[in-house]
């Protein structure tokens, strides 16, 4: 039996003269969109996580570069390129861990440098490129979903899959990476249930992953982060699939804080642990995960729920947004080009990369 995917979600949409973003800070209580017309506003949207998830940030940043190009007033080519590079620097400073952000900005800068003709022609090409980046990401995610489906355990026929954070349509241009595998498995009749870690402190699993599953009528069970090991011990989980914000050349993978703990639990219970991510998430210039910059966010994410403090005064805080899962804990990395052992990605995938 197969199922269909209903209510597709597209978090970054071009509307003729502005970008519409699904405001992910308001989900699941409220579905609303934010109109972005200036590059500075796009940078703020990325920083405040109105848009989040490495691929979605990349698409948003590409549109931010186009919007920034329209704000440049000079007719001098060198001056235009210099100001556009400044727009890129502002966007890059928003989220240091997500490599797709840097990839998209650099691609837009390269297009601007290589496009001949008047400034208006460069701007037109930048818009076309941003749209291509978004369309390519949807196709990429669907390929990731299909490749992921092909390596899921054959037994049981209908699997229970655990995921951490949100690597779904909301985190990409559409369809998702880890949830792309979920969608493909659901459509193929191979999925019984998703187990979603709540993902403290921002609760992307509780707020966003469950919301996506509910939209498409995919059975989903929410658990707190500390329950993952227990669920594995009780044989409730068959496979783990997560996303990534940056993957080093050796296969070490940075993802939302808590992913490393899930990987250790999966290893202890002999469960396959897959990372699903596009080629643009792999940083071939980074030898290993030790060099991945880890964003630290405001401590209020830890000590407040809503506007209520949950701990006494005098407590100190540490709030890294990501951790790095060592390659040896990863069963395979699912990309649009296939599924690869972490140690093979440099040899088998580096020739695919493009600026």
UniProtKB/Swiss-Prot annotation:
The lineage of its organism: Bacteria, Bacillati, Cyanobacteriota, Cyanophyceae, Acaryochloridales. The record marks 165 as: Transition state stabilizer. Its EC number is 5.3.1.23. Substrate binds at residues 52-54, 95, 204, 255-256. The active site is at 245 (proton donor). It catalyses: 5-(methylsulfanyl)-alpha-D-ribose 1-phosphate = 5-(methylsulfanyl)-D-ribulose 1-phosphate. Transmembrane segments: none annotated. Gene3D superfamilies: translation initiation factor eif-2b, domain 1 (1.20.120.420), Translation initiation factor eif-2b, domain 2 (3.40.50.10470). Catalyzes the interconversion of methylthioribose-1-phosphate (MTR-1-P) into methylthioribulose-1-phosphate (MTRu-1-P). It is an enzyme of class 5 (isomerase). PANTHER family: METHYLTHIORIBOSE-1-PHOSPHATE ISOMERASE. Keywords: Amino-acid biosynthesis, Isomerase, Methionine biosynthesis. Belongs to the eIF-2B alpha/beta/delta subunits family. MtnA subfamily. GO terms for molecular function: S-methyl-5-thioribose-1-phosphate isomerase activity. It comes from the Bacteria. This is Methylthioribose-1-phosphate isomerase. One of its GO terms (biological process) is L-methionine salvage from methylthioadenosine. It holds the Pfam family IF-2B. Pathway: Amino-acid biosynthesis; L-methionine biosynthesis via salvage pathway; L-methionine from S-methyl-5-thio-alpha-D-ribose 1-phosphate: step 1/6.
